[in-house]
Regions:
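Acidic, divalent-metal-coordinating active-site segment for phosphoryl/phosphodiester hydrolysis
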Residues: 157-172
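The conserved Walker
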Residues: 292
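Motif I (Walker A/P-loop) of helicase-class P-loop NTPases
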Residues: 295-303
Length: 303
């Protein structure tokens, strides 16, 4: 990662979410900042604040977030909290759901308020989810939280969004560590085009896994360098037809066939010869010469 030679054993991840008056960082402003710190597989701290944007919060943003003009009028300006936020993020890895928006918007606002440029590495949970949770139908944060059973009481509130994104990150990290090493190796090779330092995060997680190799899950097998789940074929011991005794006599054959077939003496004799040959356990070959019209096909198939 840029600015980080390797992932530390106790690396801190700053999971951030912003609510803003719009999507244009040149004219819109932050109205809510939420951050959850994650370290060693656990949430260790959180910080959230409303922010007075010094401009009107558009009605559609109020409707989406539930954040009103009255609420933010009592909040500090971003200039008042910028340095606190900057120092809170120092020496962390920035994490966000759609990292390009949150990182770039926040970095611009911090510089506007006089902090040094934000240069910490950043990873994107949208792309991590797309890679490691590929069967999900949607990668919107609200949809993922519902599908994965993550508590998300206030969607589009920065503190709630940051909290559920942190929980998503932890879930994805566990998923990564559960994968076969050869699978992680392939993913690391193919992740070069992911956002910011997401690829390096995947690569370094793979490097850590190589140092602590665990046996391959018995449910998988490696074929040509690819870990594949073993196909489980259920074995059924079930008869789908009724067994019956071979109809040796004329009467038995007529009962079996009913009116569908006409009884043929030569065909019946051929059937009995074939049946006796298979049931008597003889090692001799059986040779039968039958005239046209005898019914040879049924004569050897029925027994």
């Amino acid at each position: 990662m840029k600015g980080v030679k390797s992932l530390k054993d106790k690396q801190v991840y700053a999971v951030v979410d912003l609510e803003t008056t719009g999507t244009d960082p040149t004219s819109d402003r932050i109205i809510q900042f939420g951050c959850v710190l994650v370290q060693d597989g656990k949430i260790i701290a959180n910080f959230a604040t409303d922010v007075n944007p010094n401009q009107v919060v558009p009605k559609q943003i109020q409707s989406l977030t539930g954040i009103s003009n009255t609420q933010v009028q009592k909040a500090p300006y971003f200039e008042d909290v910028a340095h606190t936020i900057y120092h809170y993020l120092e020496d962390t890895i920035f994490v966000a759901h759609n990292v390009h928006f949150d990182y770039n918007f926040l970095a611009r606002e911090l510089v506007r308020c006089g902090t040094p440029p934000l240069t910490i590495p950043a990873i994107d949970t949208v792309e991590l989810a797309q890679i490691f949770l590929p069967t999900e139908k949607s990668f919107r944060l609200s949809d993922l939280s519902e599908s994965l059973g993550l508590s998300h009481e206030n969607p589009h509130q920065a503190d709630s969004d940051a909290q559920v994104t942190a929980e998503l990150l932890l879930l994805i990290q566990e998923k990564m560590k559960s994968l076969p090493l050869v699978t992680m190796e392939k993913i690391a090779e193919l992740s070069q085009q992911t956002a910011r330092e997401t690829s390096t995060f995947i690569q370094q997680t793979y490097e850590q896994m190589k140092k602590q190799v665990t046996p391959l899950n018995p449910a998988y097998q490696v074929v040509s360098g690819i870990a594949l789940r073993k196909k489980e074929v259920p074995l059924f011991e079930e008869t789908f037809y009724q067994t019956s005794t071979y109809p040796k006599t004329k009467k038995a054959k007529e009962k079996l066939f009913g009116e569908r077939f006409a009884y043929r003496a030569e065909q019946s004799r051929m059937m009995n010869l074939v049946y006796d040959h298979f049931t008597e356990g003889t090692t001799k070959d059986l040779f039968i010469e039958a005239a046209t019209g005898t019914g040879k096909t049924l004569g050897y198939l029925l027994p």
